[in-house]
């Protein structure tokens, strides 16, 4: 059975859906193929005991009025379909080091003023650092779109600059250094490799305007999927791509699916991990073996262990902040040091509010984890990993809950149900190697090997997703626009988004 479309998109995460919305709005006949029964990828939410939990994206920056993520949401036509709530403007994040808590406010000036009061000897350096963060962050914005550019490429040289060293050059106090390093958890940053461009994009967007997605991030995915369908698009679920068939004319000929379907299109966009995508491509002399070998050997960022808690009603007051709880003052994940110590690394704790906004109805805890800690179950799949795996998960969850209890008194006694997910869970749902949370490691010391262009050697095969540009919601959104610009033109697309 052969089906023909203008655009065929592999994967329905934020990247795939964004490309689907953009191109379907331009009149292209779009088809998205998703291996799971539910669209969304890392936007997926799930419900347990009538409580919603997000799986991959827990809050989104630059979502305030006239900010870049809100502008894209408006352009997609889903702004009125999702409900957002600003995180506490005085404490969008609360950094916990030893017994002290440090609150990070929204707004660059407020950020510098508040931390400058606590670390007066570093206020000038902090001011310079945050100015640089916001300069990089502002390289994407509505003004750039109005000028016909998706981003200001002149600042992308910061990809070759160390995030950790840049912080250290501006800040002397080690505690403040680690407070500022907390954002590394949101893009998979490691002290030895993290680049300043990714750091600034993620941190800057949250300083600008971090927001909760009420009702769960699945509402974003569902709303975007509905726009695609309303524009005449097709979304196929519960069906995986098994082969990308190439022709002798340097292009993709069609896609093969797990149910025997053949999907033909003018253009093909893969939002899957590049290691997965190129494994699917039929051998062709156009894509050289050295390139394929390089892609296969690239290192991926760490995965996350997640604990989801339902709570007794009206027991824990809702705290409109995201807690980052650091062990031994260090906010940077050290894979070698944390081997065999699952649950003891930096921990993020967040709450979902009840309908009246006064109480927490659930809590989510996430922490980075070393791949060697779950390597015993690498060759297993969901619901078939055995009792040892369940015991290990329970042990890790208990460690994390015990640590969270120190900043949220009464948490343990308020728990009614506990659910867990390891990187293997994410691997099986998102098809990401090792369950990596943020895809390929982008090493500032040698960025070229992990610089993945949106255009492949195959004329009509494009890439999108967090491995191409910057991880996280804002990076994936920008990358999708860059991918689609190959088809409809950057200036045209940028100005349309700006005018939405």
Protein language model regions, located:
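C-terminal segments that line or cap access tunnels to active or ligand-binding sites in enzymes
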Residues: 314-421
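Rossmann-like flavin
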Residues: 98-193
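Helical element adjacent to the flavin cofactor pocket in flavoenzyme catalytic cores
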Residues: 200-252
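A glycine-rich dinucleotide-binding beta-alpha-beta segment and adjacent secondary-structure elements
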Residues: 175-187, 406-470
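Mid-domain catalytic core of redox enzymes
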Residues: 242-358
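Active-site-proximal substrate-binding core of FAD-dependent oxidoreductases
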Residues: 246, 489-500
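N-terminal glycine-rich phosphate/pyrophosphate-binding loop and immediately adjacent elements
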Residues: 2-128, 132, 442
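A conserved FAD-binding loop/helix module that cradles the flavin
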Residues: 466-488
């Amino acid at each position: 059975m052969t089906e023909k479309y203008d655009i065929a998109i592999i994967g329905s995460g934020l990247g795939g859906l964004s490309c689907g919305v953009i191109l379907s709005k331009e009149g292209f006949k779009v088809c998205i193929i998703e291996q799971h029964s539910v669209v969304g990828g890392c936007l997926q939410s799930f419900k347990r005991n009538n409580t919603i939990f997000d799986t991959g994206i827990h809050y989104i920056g630059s979502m305030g009025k006239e900010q870049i993520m809100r502008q894209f949401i408006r352009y997609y036509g889903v702004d009125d379909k999702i409900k957002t709530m600003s995180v506490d403007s005085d404490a969008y994040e609360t950094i916990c080091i030893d017994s002290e808590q440090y609150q990070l406010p929204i707004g660059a000036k407020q950020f510098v003023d508040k931390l400058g009061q606590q670390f007066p000897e570093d206020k000038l350096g902090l001011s310079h650092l945050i100015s640089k963060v916001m300069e990089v962050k502002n390289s994407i914005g509505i003004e750039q779109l109005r000028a016909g550019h998706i981003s200001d490429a002149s600042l992308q040289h910061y990809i070759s600059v160390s995030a950790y060293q840049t912080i250290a050059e501006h800040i002397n106090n080690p505690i403040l250094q680690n407070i500022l390093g907390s954002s590394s958890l949101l893009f998979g940053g490691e002290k030895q490799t993290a680049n300043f461009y990714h750091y600034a994009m993620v941190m800057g967007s949250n300083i600008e305007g971090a927001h909760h997605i009420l009702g769960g991030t699945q509402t974003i995915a569902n709303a975007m999927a509905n726009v695609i369908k309303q524009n005449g698009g097709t979304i196929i679920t519960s069906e995986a791509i098994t082969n990308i068939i190439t022709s002798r004319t340097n292009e993709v000929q069609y896609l093969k699916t797990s149910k025997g379907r053949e999907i033909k299109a003018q253009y093909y966009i893969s939002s899957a991990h590049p290691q997965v995508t190129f494994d699917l491509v039929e051998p062709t002399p156009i894509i050289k073996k050295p390139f394929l070998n390089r892609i296969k050997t690239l290192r991926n960022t760490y995965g996350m262990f997640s604990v989801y808690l339902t709570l007794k009603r009206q027991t824990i007051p809702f705290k409109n902040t995201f807690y980052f709880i650091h062990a031994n003052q260090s906010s940077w994940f050290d894979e070698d040091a944390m081997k065999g110590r699952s649950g003891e690394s930096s921990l993020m704790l967040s709450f979902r509010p009840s309908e009246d906004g006064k109480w927490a109805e659930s809590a989510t805890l996430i922490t980075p984890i070393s791949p060697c800690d779950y390597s015993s179950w690498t060759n297993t799949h969901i619901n078939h990993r055995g009792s040892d795996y369940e015991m290990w998960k329970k042990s890790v969850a208990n460690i994390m809950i015990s640590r969270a209890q120190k900043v949220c008194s009464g948490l343990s006694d308020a728990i009614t149900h506990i659910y867990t997910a390891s990187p293997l869970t994410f691997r099986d749902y998102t098809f990401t190697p090792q369950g990596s949370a943020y895809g390929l490691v982008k090493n500032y010391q040698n960025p070229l090997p992990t610089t993945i262009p949106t255009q492949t050697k195959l004329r009509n095969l494009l890439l999108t997703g967090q491995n191409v540009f910057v991880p996280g919601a804002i990076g994936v959104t920008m990358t999708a626009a860059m991918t689609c610009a190959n088809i409809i033109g950057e200036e045209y697309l940028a100005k349309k988004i700006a005018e939405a």
